[in-house]
């Protein structure tokens, strides 16, 4: 696994090699496997993004007598696409320097919990099948003792984190709650547009990098007065 390459002497060599040649371990993706899957046959499109990595998520640089390595561990995680649970960002006060109130509201809706429980079970089936089975000694987390819905929900609530693709906090729309209009203009403020994924009414079922670029391109056209025909 990749943990071997995190030993400080090897890590330093690998970083230098990458800097000089553009090759080596740092040039590789940390994800060995990635795929879009459905949590149930009722889903008409994938609602989960499965990822596997050839290193422990908890791995850190190590060296004998300083810090012990993570060992020969692999990790798998699943992103919930287009979750039903919705968070909220609101102002704490009229002071523009005050930090906003942020409510992530993860796992508030049962469909989200159900999909992620199934994601754990799908992951177990993947690693208990050939050809992975001979290389797996045991499951470290959530552990074989976590079987029922209640146990899996408890583990999910303790470990779930953001996939760093936040959207929709300045959603476009025509209703009173919409922050921007169809031209990306902030309602009630002259000369201000928003040009990022916060204008999406809902998150897409995938990564947000490409949509963010397209929103930026569209915003540039709107500012310059360009239309599709020109």
Spans of features found by a protein language model:
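C-terminal structured subdomain/cap of oxidoreductase catalytic cores
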Residues: 1-3, 37-40, 73-132, 153-230
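Mid-to-C-terminal "cap/lid" subdomains and adjacent gly/pro-rich loops that border
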Residues: 1-69, 125-131, 154, 158, ...
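A general boundary/transition motif marking the beginning of the first structured unit of a protein
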Residues: 23, 111, 143-144
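Mobile, glycine/GP-rich and aromatic-enriched active-site lid/loop segments adjacent to catalytic centers
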Residues: 51, 119, 136-139
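Short, glycine/acidic-rich hinge or "gate" loops at secondary-structure transitions
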Residues: 133-144, 230
